[in-house]
Amino acid sequence: MNPQLNNLTLPIYMDYQATTPIDPRVMEAMLPYFTTKFGNPHSRSHSFGWEAENAVEEARSMVAKLIGADTKEIIFTSGATESNNLAIKGIAKFYSNKKNHIITVVSEHKCVLDACRHLEQEGIKITYLPIKPNGIIDLETLKNAITDQTMLVSVMVVNNEIGVVQPLKEIGQICREKGVFFHSDIAQGFGKIPIDVNAFNIDLASISGHKIYGPKGIGALYVRKKPRVRVTPLINGGGQERGIRSGTLPTPLIVGLGMAAEIAYSEMEKDTKHINYLFDRFLNNIHKRISKVYLNGDKNQRYKGNLNLSFAGVEGESMILAIKDLAVSSGSACTSASLEPSYVLRSMGIGEELAHTAIRFGIGRFTTEQEVDYAVNLICSKIDKLRELSPLWEMMQEGIDLKKIKWAVH
């Protein structure tokens, strides 16, 4: 049982980039498909199958509507990791007899970088674009990186660690002018910021259910039909999903993703207003009470549900232990098991000592003002205590440049 504190349930969930709680309306929509409406959507000879197929197609149109796509352009997958792999490897396999170059960004999600590294071993050339200190790519650098051998550019819309929003419209325009396919991992932006695949000239986009208050284990890949984009499937089988992704579709999960997309479509403005208000309240109150706290990533070009802060003079891991009443992360959930400083922060040029102190606070649909205020009070009291104990903080107060210190390795 979670402890209660003035109607506040502890611990407070602030890791919305890692996953989101399922919206009760999503759960309600899914339940019948676990119990009475259990048909296989590919069974065409009876009403159980037809009922499931109708539910799947309705969900497909809800997902498509959220990004301005055609229903036929949505392929259901097990999540964004599979979608990213299918997009990048699928394009590489299909077009590698014509072209052999892919461009991505150093701060992409691990699964995009790993898919690219896998292709490098197969002889595909990969360019990893740098990012500016604000976390955004330079468009001229992208333009100059494209050659006549480039088949694909892959740039995520919202970074999972620092929340910055890349200029997708401009990137899409460059790709279209140069005749290069444009893939975007939109898992952290889908349903949270307006994304239009046609206005942005996106050819492939990866989607995740559990980042938008839907179930885990379901996602989608948008694949453009006009002009047609071809991908070689990773999974062979019964030819479901236009032959791109075989396997029996999980109707309850798809219904959940569809419902989550429908809610996001109708409530995006309300969610954005709520999240922006809490972001500003959190950041302003922290800055009023503590010195040397830095927001990582561009303040304006960002999704405000992500608040990545570095606290000078405090070790990130000890900070997380000190604020154990807040469920937060010191990086991507997929890589935070390793205590290495975040590769995203390092690629922004942030020094090791500040990268090590970074903590990501996530704000979402169900975060309350009371939770934010509790979090701020807790952080401020713990920071003061930790800084009193920190030799690094003492050295900083004395004006010693930590970058010039030679650390001994034991």
Curated annotation (Swiss-Prot):
Substrates-to-products reaction catalysed: (sulfur carrier)-H + L-cysteine = (sulfur carrier)-SH + L-alanine
Main localization of the protein described in the UniProt heading: cytoplasm
Pfam families: Aminotran_5
Enzyme Commission identifier(s): 2.8.1.7
Domain of life the protein comes from: Bacteria
PROSITE patterns, alphabetized: AA_TRANSFER_CLASS_5
Gene Ontology terms, MF aspect: 2 iron, 2 sulfur cluster binding; cysteine desulfurase activity; metal ion binding; pyridoxal phosphate binding
Pathway participation: Cofactor biosynthesis; iron-sulfur cluster biosynthesis
Record's keyword annotation contains Amino-acid biosynthesis: no
Binding locations of [2Fe-2S] cluster: C334
Top-level class of the enzyme under EC nomenclature: transferase
Binding site for pyridoxal 5'-phosphate: A80, T81, N160, Q188, S208, G209, H210, T248
Keyword tags: 2Fe-2S, Cytoplasm, Iron, Iron-sulfur, Metal-binding, Pyridoxal phosphate, Transferase
Any one GO CC term of the record: L-cysteine desulfurase complex
Positions of the catalytic residues: C334
Cellular compartment(s): Cytoplasm
Location of N6-(pyridoxal phosphate)lysine modifications: K211
Keyword check for Cell inner membrane: no
UniProt subunit comment: Homodimer. Forms a heterotetramer with IscU, interacts with other sulfur acceptors.
Similarity annotation: Belongs to the class-V pyridoxal-phosphate-dependent aminotransferase family. NifS/IscS subfamily.
Biological role stated in the UniProt entry: Master enzyme that delivers sulfur to a number of partners involved in Fe-S cluster assembly, tRNA modification or cofactor biosynthesis. Catalyzes the removal of elemental sulfur atoms from cysteine to produce alanine. Functions as a sulfur delivery protein for Fe-S cluster synthesis onto IscU, an Fe-S scaffold assembly protein, as well as other S acceptor proteins.
NCBIfam families: IscS, PRK02948.1, PRK14012.1
UniProt protein name: Cysteine desulfurase IscS
Chain's gene name: iscS
